[in-house]
Amino acid sequence: PGTYLQDRYEILSLIGTGGMSEVYQAKCHTLNRLVAIKVLKDEYSQDANFVSKFKMEAQAAAGLSHPNIVSVYDVVDEGSLHYIVMELIEGITLKSYILKKGHLGVKETIGIAIQVAQGLAAAHDQHIVHRDIKPQNMIISRDGKVKVADFGIARAVSSQTIGVNAVGSVHYISPEQAKGNYSDG
């Protein structure tokens, strides 16, 4: 907190931590708005492979503009510091929401699923496959809007990229992928 990035973004607080990155709430003083900043962890910032994957996430998501997808505003490399500036969603992950409520009714579940499907369809229309769909990567805003986040292992799909590699979180990949069979991305 209190740290500035690019003399523009003031870090306010840590929102969450993932395997490769930490996400902070920040204030953009140029546009006078709150944003989320996803920072690649230090232990990965010198690894060209991780830096490349991190940039690919930003590039995959940056071209997507849809009410059910978290918007990417900027991607920045400052020496060994790599970060993505994104839309800040005031809310909680679908995983936290489910744990908090304990049970979701059919109507609510369908409403959430429709919003997720609309976001994924918009990504697919741009030939982007998310490849890591799980409750932790869905954010529900305070007003009930569901947004797909974390395109970290997304892939631009063409006939050359369709393969048999299993990619995703082990608890959420399809049985076909787990067996090493055909996968569309």
Regions found by a protein language model. Give the residues of each.
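Protein kinase glycine-rich loop
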Residues: 12-18, 23
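Protein kinase catalytic-loop region centered on the HRD/HxD motif
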Residues: 118-128
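AlphaC helix of the eukaryotic protein kinase fold
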Residues: 41-63
